[in-house]
Amino acid sequence: MIGATYDTLILSDIHLGSEVSRAQDALDVLQTYSYRRLVLLGDIFSDLNFRRLTSEHWKFLSYIRKLSNPKRQVEVVWVEGNHDTGLANLMSHLVGVPVYQRYVWEYEGKRHLAMHGHQFDGFVKKNLWIGRLGEWIFLQIQKVDSRTKCVSRFLDRMNTRWLLLSDKVARGAVRDAQIGKCERVFCGHTHVALSLICDGVEYYNSGSWVDARATFLTINQQGVEIQTYAGGTHHRCPSTERKPVAAEAADLFESAGLPALAGYQSLRC
């Protein structure tokens, strides 16, 4: 079933590999709407350990590769986030899309800038190892959390509020947009969906796909909208779905002409 038609869809912070990733719901959005451009705005992966990807996560990646086929006439862009840093070369081959740190395009006479937003997060930049430790602790909590992952999602929301990231990222993004003479700027990273106008620049945050409220952005001639996923959350036990090498993973690597998945199972020790 095809829903509304848009020029651009923007999704961020899907965190493939995380127990709370709503990859199936994100895939549902991609398959429901019609669009000319798809911007994956960073942190598509939770980390660089492919062994944590479930069958649903591989299906999401496989669909991205299908969208990148020129016959689809969809421009697919991957903007690098702090969690998927280091995957640019592999992802450009695996799913067939270009990877950027900053992406600029024009639509309806306005310059648009997309960047993940971690560039304005001083804590992430200055405390890399503390951040890695926090990721590991959060992973352990996810493993023992209930089926609905209520505790994990609550901690994720509180984490972004403790760091006061939302306002900090917005201010930094607006400054960058002004320097680049862009009228609109889009970020992720904070997991908090937001829209505001500051000094003549429209700022939008696409939210995340790890919370009970999953959000994404749409752009058409009427403007930019924050959309909330209307379907239900797919509750399941991801740890029971992990296989040594999922069939979807093997097919994806083969279609990309890359060596077997085993060589990439963990890109960060």
Predicted regions and their residues:
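Core catalytic region of metal-dependent phosphoesterases/phosphodiesterases
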Residues: 2-7, 16-107
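Binuclear metal-dependent phosphoesterase catalytic core
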Residues: 107-108, 197-269
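Conserved catalytic scaffold of divalent metal-dependent phosphoesterases
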Residues: 77-181
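Mobile, glycine- and charge-enriched loop segments
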Residues: 1-20, 130-163, 240, 245-246, ...
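Active-site environment of divalent metal-dependent phosphoester hydrolases
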Residues: 16-19, 45-49, 79-89, 119-123, ...
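Divalent metal-coordination and catalytic microenvironments
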Residues: 13, 38, 43, 64, ...
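Active-site-proximal beta-strand elements of phosphoester/diester hydrolases
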Residues: 7-15, 111-118, 202-207
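Extended, basic/helix-rich recognition subdomains
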Residues: 162-221
